[in-house]
Curated annotation (Swiss-Prot):
Entry's localization field: Cell membrane
Gene expressing this chain: atpG
PROSITE patterns the record matches: ATPASE_GAMMA (PS00153)
Record text on subunit structure and interactions: F-type ATPases have 2 components, CF(1) - the catalytic core - and CF(0) - the membrane proton channel. CF(1) has five subunits: alpha(3), beta(3), gamma(1), delta(1), epsilon(1). CF(0) has three main subunits: a, b and c.
MF GO annotations: ATP binding; proton-transporting ATP synthase activity, rotational mechanism
Topology relative to the membrane: Peripheral membrane protein
One of the GO biological process terms: proton motive force-driven plasma membrane ATP synthesis
Protein known as: ATP synthase gamma chain
HAMAP family for the chain: ATP_synth_gamma_bact (MF_00815)
Gene3D superfamilies for this protein: 3.40.1380.10, ATP synthase, gamma subunit, helix hairpin domain
Length: 326
């Protein structure tokens, strides 16, 4: 059994750590509320621009490069969204695992994978493994800003527009010399953590480009719902100036850019929730450990007192016996 001083030192150390984890838990909780508020604030714009795109899609030819799957694609960009800070449980590990699965699948399909990373933890992870990263952006994982995420958003859109046979212009954050042109790609995938609830966050893969045909599905589902409800709503007839194809050309990049920014916002909420859960678990474990150590310390203290009493009684008995013999 450890001596009493060692046990008390351990209790003080655990209590000190507990204060840190509790503070981190409270900070993460407040950040979750803020992050959820930002996600909710961005939702109306995203919904409206999607409605406009639905109208444009129904009136245009839908023959747009950002909507069309390219035959014989050669290169696929994968953006891995990680955190800038640790103490978030399995948040980053799960994303890295999901990204590895995606990269393996793309390689089996014949694509050359071009990896991009956001977040210091992702940069450090791939650097330690000596895996090449074509571009990295850090400093905004907990509080994404529209301007701070500009370069990564524009590069992914420009790189896809250029195709694997063309080149895109250099942007800050890319792992090449300034001014050098960058080879484009034919697909863009984003691996990030989806915020499901305060207790659940899961890594997901989202194909950013080409845009998956969810617009037509959404229109069909809403139409089926209206029929099942017995409603016969007449959709308004819009006129587009100059024409639907031109407007689609202008709005699609904005839609994709906004979609990627929404992913950063959701990942920020998931990061804070994951950190809050990890810190709460650490705080609870520290509380239990202090209870166990205190129980052991009390037993050690009781044993020490018992031993001291025994020694005193024994000593007194010895002195008493010595006096009688005299």
């Amino acid at each position: 059994m450890a001596n009493l001083r060692e046990l008390r030192d351990r209790i003080r150390s655990v209590n000190s750590t507990k204060k840190i984890t509790k503070a981190q838990e409270l900070i993460a909780t407040s950040r979750i509320t803020k992050a959820q508020g930002r996600v909710a604030a961005a939702a109306p714009y995203a919904e409206e621009i999607q409605k406009v795109l639905e109208r444009l899609a129904s009136a245009s030819s839908l023959d747009h490069p950002m909507l069309r799957e390219r035959e014989g694609g050669k290169r696929a960009a994968v953006l891995v969204v990680s955190s800038d800070r640790g103490m978030a449980g399995g948040y980053n590990h799960n994303v890295f695992k999901k990204a590895a699965e995606l990269e393996k699948l793309l390689a089996e399909q014949g694509y050359e994978v071009v990896r991009y990373v956001t977040g210091s933890k992702g940069v450090g992870y791939y650097k330690f493994r000596e895996d090449y990263v074509a571009g990295a952006w850090t400093g905004f994982s907990q509080d994404p800003d529209w301007n701070a995420t500009h370069d990564v958003r524009r590069h992914l859109i420009d790189g896809f527009t250029a195709t694997s046979d063309g080149t895109a212009k250099w942007r800050d954050g890319l792992n090449v010399a300034e001014g050098q042109e960058i080879q484009g790609f034919d697909q863009v995938h984003v691996v990030y953590t989806e915020f499901v609830s305060m207790l659940t966050q899961k890594p997901v893969v989202h194909q950013l480009l080409p845009v998956e045909p969810v617009i037509e599905d959404d229109i069909f589902e809403r139409g089926e719902s209206a029929l099942s409800d017995g409603k016969n709503e007449i959709e308004p007839d819009y006129e587009f100036e100059p024409d639907a194809d031109t407007l689609l050309e202008a709005l699609l990049p904005q839609y994709i850019s906004r979609r990627l920014f929404s992913i950063f916002l959701e990942a920020a909420a998931a990061e804070s929730a994951s950190r809050r859960n990890a810190m709460k678990s650490a705080t609870d474990n520290a509380t239990e450990l202090v209870k166990d150590l205190s129980r052991v310390a009390n037993a050690a203290r009781q044993a020490q007192i018992t031993q001291e009493i025994t020694e005193i009684v024994g000593g007194a008995g010895a002195l008493s016996g010595s006096g009688e013999s005299d």
